[in-house]
Amino acid sequence: MKQHIAIIIALCMVACNTNKSTDALLVEVWNNDQSAREQMVELTRAVTIEGRTDLIDSLIAGVEAVEKVDIKNISIIDSLLRDGLPENLTPQSYKTIWIVIDHASLDKQEQYLPLIEEMSQNGLIGKDEHAILYDRIAMKRNCPQRYGSQTVQFGKPDAMNLYVYPVENPALLDSLRASVGMSSMEEYLKQLTKTTGIEAKYDAELTIEQLEAMRGIFK
């Protein structure tokens, strides 16, 4: 009996150590993801809002750096999820798994969308995080999004535009957003405008074709 108890305790200690190791790895993954993006956002703002054309090469390098980080991070998540979703990780670790998938290529996003939905249903991540991934996939497929979380930015440095990507059911948009814990579209637009420094716009009647035509003018 004592031997059995000792074995159980030993196994628990191994599991705890494994979880701590995984959590530590995912902290590093999160930091790499955020650090690369923060630098790119600062450069993007400088070029597009402040007109710092002298930083264009730095911005291009920043975009490439983000892409490299994303590729490395999703390979780590692939390995981590090979035998299924680890249990008993910290909330931040589960959020990191989501954000790496959210920043991955379309095929990886589609591959893991069912897992992300399951994680949100089980309370490991927020329902809004599943909604964001769902919308991102829809936009990449050139389809209307459901929750209005995705935006597109285009224009010239002194005249940038920021539009919410078209949604599939404008009449139900705010109720759909509320169902996953998102703010109203009105509040979201205020938040976007404050964060980006660009007036965020939402046109319920705007189609994908019309939006692409608007973007094409600046290409």
How should each PLM-predicted stretch be described?
Residues N17-P86:
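Start-of-domain marker
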Residues V69-I74, D78-K219:
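Short beta-strand and adjacent turn/loop elements
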